[in-house]
């Protein structure tokens, strides 16, 4: 490709909304055009990157027996109602919903578990067809409340999603292991630093689940890592620091605490450390059409983990109750909620069990109690793990070694779903006794755009993008000084030679200074620059510079040999482009 024929535009300044590096550079380098908030057009440059990324995905999934399909973007509500997810997704207001001319409710696909389950249920004829692995690479939709960070959180995005159907839990685990390894190979080919962490399945499913996170400072997710074990902070099991509490139980006392609402205020008012204060939070849960409220007690120095609370209570969703809801159901203002005389069911974190003579609210405004004790002043509640893991907490999966905390961007998620969806759609087969057996299902997904954005966040430098060679739009840029007729002739000859051999060069044939072209090549993130500069006239040697700054010299006669050792060769050669008039 010649730069003069490439439809692109670079810019010195990015959109004012470009709050992250990846979004800023994709716009400045001419890869991305903002059509609307959270909706983007991919330019020819970015489409080349996308095609290479998706080709890597196809190669790895085909290698383990995956079969590519194309599932509909428009889905009927009745399929989602079979699994109970229609109302669950509607409650989050993230689903694009519409009605057809027959007034039937439809949605734009955020995922495809229901559609693929219906498909396989109709076509599966026998156990001998199992396991089945179907995958697609296509568009998904999510009506984000606050679309931001460019491709990190968009309303319309590109995903690879895989679905496996197996005849047993053991076969399901085998498929899970195959997909997990295939995903590792995909990210390894991009030379990314990433971790695989235990995760919560959320609304997709409650079975075994892991996330792939690319490590970078921007990361929206907090990752807990200890040795070879890692977990999303929402799923991480942790052993917090323990404390020794009083053995001599003191009489409970009510204390006036006018407008003392926060743990920090109580710490100062009572001159006592936070771990001796009991914090009570009210959560609202949803299970199908039912909403309930619960009180959750945790130590004052810790934060609540709503994902763990939802799992403990076995509900679909869980969130902190609003001030209005607290006032309505407990008849007390936020900041004065406690387990004493609590009118709603109350549970406590395991770390509160040894607490004695603690301070807590008693559901009266401007009043707290001190010297409160479990069993004596408050009936012993059911205890569970309700805490977010923190740096320094001990990891039970790694022999009690401490956690380190990192930020990561989730780029892939894999799940074992069991029979949750296959039961709803009767996806199964007859066993040797003639009895119907349900299939065991897995679902897996890679965010293509998120992966590329995370790649930029991790690898880019102050000069611009730094694409891995595997997905760069072009492998090498051929550069010469504008107006240098001899350099132009040499560049054209080299371009035609590399192009014919499938090395995907970009010939910068603009009438611009060499320095300008060099900066543009760095901004675009092209892995190598082939420079026909002043030294070529005296030495006859070409200069090759990598994006990382490493340099070498090569003669025109040995250029193809160098390329064959350092650049990918695409077997489908790019046909010669038309010459300019």
Swiss-Prot record:
User: What InterPro entries has UniProt attached to this entry?
Assistant: aa-tRNA-synt_IIb, aa-tRNA-synth_II, aa-tRNA-synth_II/BPL/LPL, Anticodon-bd, Anticodon-bd_dom_sf, Pro-tRNA-ligase_IIa, Pro-tRNA-synth_IIa_bac-type, Pro-tRNA-Synthase_IIa_type1
Q: Tell me any Pfam family this protein matches.
A: tRNA-synt_2b
- EC number(s) reported in the record: 6.1.1.15
GO BP:
prolyl-tRNA aminoacylation
Q: What class of enzyme is it?
A: ligase
- Molecular function GO terms recorded: aminoacyl-tRNA deacylase activity; ATP binding; proline-tRNA ligase activity
A GO CC term assigned to this protein in UniProt: cytosol
The family assignment reads: Belongs to the class-II aminoacyl-tRNA synthetase family. ProS type 1 subfamily.
Q: What is this protein called?
A: Proline--tRNA ligase
| Native species | Chlamydia trachomatis serovar L2 (strain ATCC VR-902B / DSM 19102 / 434/Bu)
Q: What is the lineage of its organism?
A: Bacteria, Pseudomonadati, Chlamydiota, Chlamydiia, Chlamydiales
State the gene name recorded for this protein: proS
């Amino acid at each position: 490709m010649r730069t003069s024929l490439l439809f692109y535009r670079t810019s010195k300044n990015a959109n004012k909304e470009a709050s992250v590096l990846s979004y800023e550079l994709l716009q400045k380098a001419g890869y991305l055009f903002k059509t609307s908030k959270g909706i983007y057009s991919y330019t020819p440059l970015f489409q080349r990157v996308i095609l290479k990324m998706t080709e890597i995905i196809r190669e790895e999934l085909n290698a383990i027996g995956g079969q590519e399909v194309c599932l509909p973007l428009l889905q009927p509500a009745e399929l989602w109602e079979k699994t109970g997810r229609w109302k669950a997704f509607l409650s989050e207001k993230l689903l694009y919903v519409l009605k057809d001319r027959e007034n039937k409710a439809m949605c734009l696909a955020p995922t495809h578990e229901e559609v693929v389950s219906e498909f396989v249920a109709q076509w599966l004829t026998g156990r001998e067809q199992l396991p089945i692995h179907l995958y697609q690479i296509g568009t998904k939709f999510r009506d984000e409340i606050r679309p931001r960070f460019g491709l990190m959180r968009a309303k319309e995005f590109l995903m690879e999603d895989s679905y496996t159907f197996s005849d047993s839990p053991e076969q399901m685990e085998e498929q899970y292991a195959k997909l997990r390894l295939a995903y590792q190979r995909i990210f390894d080919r991009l030379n990314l630093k990433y971790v695989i962490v235990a995760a919560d399945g959320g609304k997709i499913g409650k079975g075994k689940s892991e996330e792939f996170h690319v490590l970078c400072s921007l990361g929206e997710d907090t990752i807990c890592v200890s040795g070879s074990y890692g977990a999303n902070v929402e799923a991480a099991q942790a052993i917090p620091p323990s404390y020794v509490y009083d053995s001599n139980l003191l009489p409970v006392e009510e204390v006036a605490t006018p407008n003392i609402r926060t743990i920090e205020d109580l710490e100062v008012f009572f001159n006592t450390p936070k771990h001796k204060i009991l914090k009570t939070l009210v959560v609202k849960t949803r299970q199908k059409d039912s909403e309930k409220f619960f009180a959750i007690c945790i130590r004052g120095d810790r934060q609540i983990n709503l994902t763990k609370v939802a799992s403990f209570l076995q509900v679909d969703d869980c969130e902190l109750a609003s001030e209005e809801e607290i006032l309505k159901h407990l008849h007390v203002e936020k900041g004065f909620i406690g387990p004493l005389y609590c009118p709603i069911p109350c549970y406590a974190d395991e770390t509160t069990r040894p607490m004695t003579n603690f301070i807590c609210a008693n559901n009266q405004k401007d009043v707290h109690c001190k010297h409160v004790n479990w069993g004596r002043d408050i009936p012993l509640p059911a205890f569970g793990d309700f805490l977010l893991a923190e740096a320094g907490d001990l990891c039970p999966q790694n022999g009690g070694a401490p956690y380190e905390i990192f930020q990561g961007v989730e780029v892939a998620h894999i799940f074992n779903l069991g029979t949750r969806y296959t039961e709803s759609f009767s996806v199964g087969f007859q066993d040797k006794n003639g009895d119907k057996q349900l299939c065991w299902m897995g679902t897996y997904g890679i965010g293509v755009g998120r992966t590329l954005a995370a790649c930029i966040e991790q690898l880019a430098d102050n000069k611009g993008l730094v694409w891995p060679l595997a997905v760069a739009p072009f492998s090498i840029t051929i550069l010469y000084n504008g107006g240098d007729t001899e350099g132009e002739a040499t560049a054209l000859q080299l371009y035609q030679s590399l192009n014919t051999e499938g090395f995907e060069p970009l010939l910068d044939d603009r009438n611009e200074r060499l320095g300008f072209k060099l900066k543009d090549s760095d901004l675009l993130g092209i892995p190598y620059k082939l420079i026909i500069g002043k030294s070529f006239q005296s030495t006859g040697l070409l200069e090759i510079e990598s994006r990382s700054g490493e340099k070498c010299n090569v003669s025109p006669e040995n250029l193809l040999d160098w390329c064959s050792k350092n650049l990918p060769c695409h077997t489908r050669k790019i046909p010669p482009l038309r010459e300019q008039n």
